[in-house]
Design a protein with these regions (language model features):
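C-terminal catalytic "cap/lid" subdomain
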Residues: 24-335
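N-terminal amphipathic/hydrophobic targeting modules at extreme N-termini
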Residues: 1-3, 10-13
Length: 335
């Protein structure tokens, strides 16, 4: 049905649809850590551009929850903390990776929260913004702990990567852009602070949660939580967050406008619509790079299948609003 106005109930929410466009959706937006810049100054400016786009979505009547990556940031934090330990090992003990993730959640959330608050005020929208320090439970037996694949930190030359590998660190090439350190990236199982995130969302706040994929934690035998040496992929964490909040749309923002097959190769083709089944064919064919587009497509497929009427959109930041309107981006949903 097109050209008219009608109501539908999707994922527990009542929406007004007009000309095929769903209005007033609950949306989880996943921001890439690479889009936040390589240092504090770059991040300060980057989050302000990001906030403008997100506030556009809020101004359209959507309820928005934000998750974000931290790949470059958590690597820089870990490197800085390791340097302090090297300089003075008696004073500065090694900093565990989950603590580094928590640090990244704090300072990225701080910048996002300020930028969103300013952008909302500029538009005359009265909405509180909250950042929730979020733990995400993983399985200690997840095979990912034996096969690190998650890139963190800045890009390196091949020579720098070989030197780091000689120190016992795992490194890999990242989508033809250089080499990066990689760490374990287990699948998220449960969001520990979900009740808090849901309460704030239902109260009408703009919530930043699951930063950097969430602080990875495992349940010990006594059922207490303990940190895990890993970084959870933010796309999978955002997908779990979207499912858990009964969201209608998962938007995964990346550096390209659409998903492509044969990316940067002869015959490169950009895709506008995919069913989960079509996406899985391309996944099986190795069309998407591990650590870059692959987890985005896998997360999108998972969300599209999680309940009737749900969809995922993969596009770049400045195209998010147009993507919601169906004008661009790659939308993954059941036929």
């Amino acid at each position: 049905m097109s050209g008219g106005t009608f109501f539908s109930r999707v994922a527990g929410h009542l929406h007004l649809r007009k000309a095929g466009i769903t209005m007033s959706q609950r949306i989880v937006v996943a921001l890439g850590g690479n889009a936040l810049g390589n240092n504090l100054t770059e991040q300060y400016h980057a989050v302000r551009e990001t906030a403008k786009v997100i506030v556009d979505l809020i101004a359209d009547g959507n309820q928005v929850v934000i998750a974000h990556g931290n790949g470059p940031q958590v690597g820089m934090i870990q490197k800085a903390m390791a340097e302090l330990t090297r300089i003075n090992p008696e004073k500065y003990v090694p900093c565990p990776l989950p603590v580094c993730v928590a640090m990244s959640q704090g300072y990225i959330g701080y910048d996002l929260q300020r930028a969103l608050d300013e952008a909302l005020r500029d538009r005359g929208i009265a909405k509180p913004v909250s950042t929730v320090l979020t733990q995400v439970e993983v399985d200690p037996e997840d095979p990912a702990f034996q096969h690190p694949t998650k890139p963190i930190g800045s890009f390196m030359t091949q020579q720098e990567a070989e030197a780091l590998a000689a120190q016992g660190c795992a490194v890999m090439e990242d989508a033809g852009r250089g080499y990066r350190k990689v760490v374990a990236s287990p699948q998220p199982k449960a969001i520990v602070e979900l009740a808090a995130v849901r309460a704030l969302t239902e109260a009408g706040q703009v919530v930043v949660a699951c930063g950097g994929g969430g602080i990875p934690v495992c349940r010990a035998e006594n059922r207490r939580l303990q940190g895990a040496e890993a970084v959870i992929d933010k796309d999978f964490a955002a997908e779990l967050l979207a499912e858990s909040l009964d969201a209608d749309l998962l938007i995964i923002l990346t550096a390209v406008e659409k998903v492509a097959i044969r990316f940067r190769q002869p015959g490169e083709t950009w895709l506008s619509e995919l069913t989960p089944e079509e996406a899985e064919v391309y996944i099986a064919a190795g069309e998407f790079g591990a650590g870059s587009m692959l987890p985005k497509v896998e997360a999108a497929v998972r969300f599209a299948r999680s309940a009737p009427g749900r969809a995922a959109l993969i596009t770049e930041l400045q195209k998010a609003r147009a993507g919601i309107a169906g004008e661009t981006g790659t939308r993954i949903r059941e036929a």
